[in-house]
Design a protein with these regions (language model features):
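OB-fold/S1-family single-stranded nucleic acid-binding modules
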Residues: 100-124
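Short aromatic-glycine-enriched beta-strand elements
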Residues: 47-58
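Conserved hydrophobic positions within beta-strands
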Residues: 37-41
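Short, structured beta-strand/loop micro-motifs enriched in basic residues and often containing a Trp
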Residues: 71-79
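Short nucleic-acid-contacting surface segments enriched for D/E, G, S/T with interspersed K/R
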Residues: 78-95
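Positively charged n-region of N-terminal signal peptides that target proteins for export
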Residues: 1-5
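Short boundary/loop segments of OB/S1/cold-shock single-stranded nucleic-acid-binding domains
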Residues: 20-35
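Bacterial N-terminal signal peptides
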Residues: 7-19
Length: 126
C-alpha cells in the first residue's frame, strides 16, 4: 500500500509539472509574424498568472475587431514600471506583438506604445 501511494505521488508530481510547464510556453503564437495594431483599450485585466489587455482595432476594411493581448504576470510587469492603472478604458495605444497561430484575435504582447509616445515593454516570454 505504501508503495502505491509513493508511485501515485511521484506520478502526480510529474504530471502537474508538465502541465505547468506547457502552460507558460508561447507556442500558441506565431513568433515569426510581428503585427502592429492601433488600439482603443476596452479592459485591462491585472490578474495572475497573466495580465490581459482587451482592445478594439480596425481591420483593413474599417471594421472593428475585438482583440485580447496576453502579457506576463503582474509582478514582472511591476518591475518594468507597469501598474494596475497603466491602462484605462478608452486609452489610445499602439500594440505590437505576435498573433495566435489559430487565427483568432489573440496576441502575445511584445511592446505597447502610449498615446504620448512612451513605450512600455514587458520582459519577453521565452
Amino acid at each position: 500500500m505504501r508503495l502505491r501511494c509513493m508511485i501515485f505521488a511521484v506520478t502526480a508530481a510529474i504530471l502537474f509539472n508538465a502541465a505547468a510547464f506547457s502552460h507558460h510556453g508561447a507556442s500558441a503564437y506565431d513568433r515569426s509574424n510581428r503585427i502592429t495594431l492601433k488600439a482603443s483599450i476596452t479592459e485591462f485585466k491585472w490578474t495572475n498568472p497573466h495580465v490581459y489587455i482587451l482592445f478594439d482595432a480596425l481591420d483593413p476594411k474599417g471594421n472593428t475587431d475585438h482583440w485580447s493581448c496576453e502579457s506576463i504576470n503582474p509582478g514582472m510587469l511591476s518591475k518594468q514600471g507597469w501598474t494596475r492603472r497603466t491602462l484605462n478604458f478608452g486609452d489610445k495605444v499602439t500594440i505590437i506583438g505576435f498573433p495566435a497561430k489559430s487565427g483568432s484575435k489573440v496576441m502575445l504582447l511584445e511592446k505597447l506604445i502610449l498615446a504620448d509616445g512612451k513605450p512600455l515593454v514587458p520582459a519577453l516570454l521565452d
